[in-house]
Amino acid sequence: FMAPALVRRENLVGTGWFGGPNNPTEEDVYKTQDDIYLSGTAEVSMMGYHRDEIMNTDEFPKLYAAFSPCYRREAGSHGKDTKGIFRVHEFFKVEQVILCRADHQESVKWHEELTKNSEEIMQMLEIPYRVVLNCGGDLGLGQVKKYDIEGWLPSENKYRETHSASYFHDFQTRRLNIKYRDGDNLKFAHSLNNTAMATPRILCMFLENHQNPDSSINIPKALQKFFEKEKIG
């Protein structure tokens, strides 16, 4: 999907974007004079795409990869990451979004699959990384479980977040009224999401981990067929 960046407030509220101690406030999101918001992730528009919809069980799982420009006002806030390209106001991101049956084990399975997808990307880019299980105090509004994937940033001598994988059970779908038929019953679907790739943030780890003393950049094996060379510069 090419997801729109402009979203309605009700879709931000429905996905849990506002509210909760670890979530952005309305002041953190760009807003137009027409009361339309610039979204910080394609998750918002993809969930809004199914708002007020009733689906059939055999339509699940819904597996999406959605590309969109993203906008966040918190970039450089409180003196944090004010320089460089790690935290910026506008960036591009591919987001993985899943809707599945209202079953806990189903959510757990797809959550692990989403995380595995992102791990494979980091492995193909040959970027050292770790997977962090977030504690309850770090969860956003409605999140049941969340993994962060953090890539190694040599200039800071520490790992920094590149991906965030969460599942919500029916928190988002109840707010957005996304249901499916299960026999004679209507049930709220379960929702999940995870970053696939966000630029330019991933470039920080990519360049720092592959740069040589002569400033040339080693090309990971997975990308060499596109560059037709092993290094650039």
Where are these regions (language model features)?
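TRNA-recognition modules of translation machinery and tRNA-sensing kinases, especially anticodon-binding
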Residues: 1-233
